[in-house]
Amino acid sequence: MEHSFKTITAGVVFVVLLLQQAPVLIRATDADPLQDFCVADLDSKVTVNGHACKPASAAGDEFLFSSKIATGGDVNANPNGSNVTELDVAEWPGVNTLGVSMNRVDFAPGGTNPPHVHPRATEVGIVLRGELLVGIIGTLDMGNRYYSKVVRAGETFVIPRGLMHFQFNVGKTEATMVVSFNSQNPGIVFVPLTLFGSNPPIPTPVLVKALRVDTGVVELLKSKFTGGY
């Protein structure tokens, strides 16, 4: 009985210690800031994991505010029928070191934000208008499970860091969503463009073997992405 009690006690202590570390494990992907703000000097030649700071005296109030995503772009500007207005550190230097960024995405009817991955951030989004099919694909060890739901205006969704996902406008009118990331530079890997539009190209035999299709199919798909996104 005494041995069993000691075993249970040790287990409880282990769980408590693990929970105490939880905030460290789930904190933002970017490093914590060491000052109130560090407005990115995008012209600096200093190489760091992020951007060097402008002198505080050179940073006006405007670095705290942006109207860039107040309006969207042309949804017919590319074959996907969508337009992404980015608000990461390159577009909003004030978020440098703060571990946040945003995007606005507008969709034509039938438009899509193709399957892609954000390797450095979790994504949280809200649909402002229209209705979007949001799809998320789990990892291989989770059985490649596909999760999806039609998300309507005022509803939200979350994309775990690194998982493949997409959005598709299933409505008859244009749709808009705004998403935020826990990184100033979440990165993006578009799956179709990565496979068939890389620079230099992935060797065709590799894709033929991996996708289990004929050479002609791979060459056709490559021809669709020669101009990029």
UniProtKB/Swiss-Prot annotation:
It comes from Oryza sativa subsp. japonica. CDD domains: cupin_OxOx. Residues 67-219 form the Cupin type-1 domain. Mn(2+) binds at H116, H118, E123, H165. InterPro entries: Cupin_1 (IPR006045), Germin (IPR001929), Germin_Mn-BS (IPR019780), RmlC-like_jellyroll (IPR014710), RmlC_Cupin_sf (IPR011051). May play a role in plant defense. Probably has no oxalate oxidase activity even if the active site is conserved. GO terms for cellular component: apoplast. Its main location: secreted. Disulfide bonds join C38-C53. Residues 1-31 form the signal peptide. Keywords: Apoplast, Disulfide bond, Glycoprotein, Manganese, Metal-binding, Secreted, Signal. Oligomer (believed to be a pentamer but probably hexamer). One of its GO terms (molecular function) is manganese ion binding. The keyword Manganese applies. Pfam families: Cupin_1. Glycans are attached at N80, N83. It is found in: Secreted, Extracellular space, Apoplast. Belongs to the germin family. This is Putative germin-like protein 3-4.
